[in-house]
Amino acid sequence: MFSWIKGKEGEDKAVEYLRNSGYRILERNFRSRFGEIDIIAEDNGTIVIVEVRSKGSTGYGYPEESIDHKKVRKIIKTAQFYLLKRDIKGKQVRFDIISIVNNNIFHIKNAFDLDY
């Protein structure tokens, strides 16, 4: 349960950061049979799919290093399902990672794409 609470705190910080950066939050914790997307936002007409990872330190690596190929594929499939379900067409889609270490936020834009 502790990791779930920490994860939610990280996602809350990421949402606050994105809003302060001018993003419009469309969805949080969108789930499908393919997986889950932490945050779906819009930035100047681009749909932004955001995976949030947070840690207390980098002693065992950076948070974003825990996102493996399998997780990326799940995020992409879930994003494709989301776009289809919401009938979103003709918009650019970007995949970002927000990495949080000790309250420091690192925003990695275009972390991967549909061809990953």
Swiss-Prot record:
- Ranges that cross the membrane: none
Domain of life of the organism encoding this protein: Bacteria
List the Gene Ontology MF annotations in alphabetical order. nucleic acid binding
SUPFAM superfamilies given in the database record: Restriction endonuclease-like
Cross-referenced InterPro entries, in alphabetical order? Restrct_endonuc-II-like (IPR011335), tRNA_endonuc-like_dom_sf (IPR011856), UPF0102_YraN-like (IPR003509)
Signal sequence coordinates: none
Enumerate the CDD domains for this protein. Answer: PoNe_Nuclease (cd20736)
Task: State the PANTHER family in the record.
Answer: UPF0102 PROTEIN YRAN
Q: Which family does it belong to?
A: Belongs to the UPF0102 family.
Protein's name according to its UniProt entry: UPF0102 protein PERMA_0362
Source organism (scientific name):
Persephonella marina (strain DSM 14350 / EX-H1)
The lineage, from the top, is: Bacteria, Pseudomonadati, Aquificota, Aquificia, Aquificales
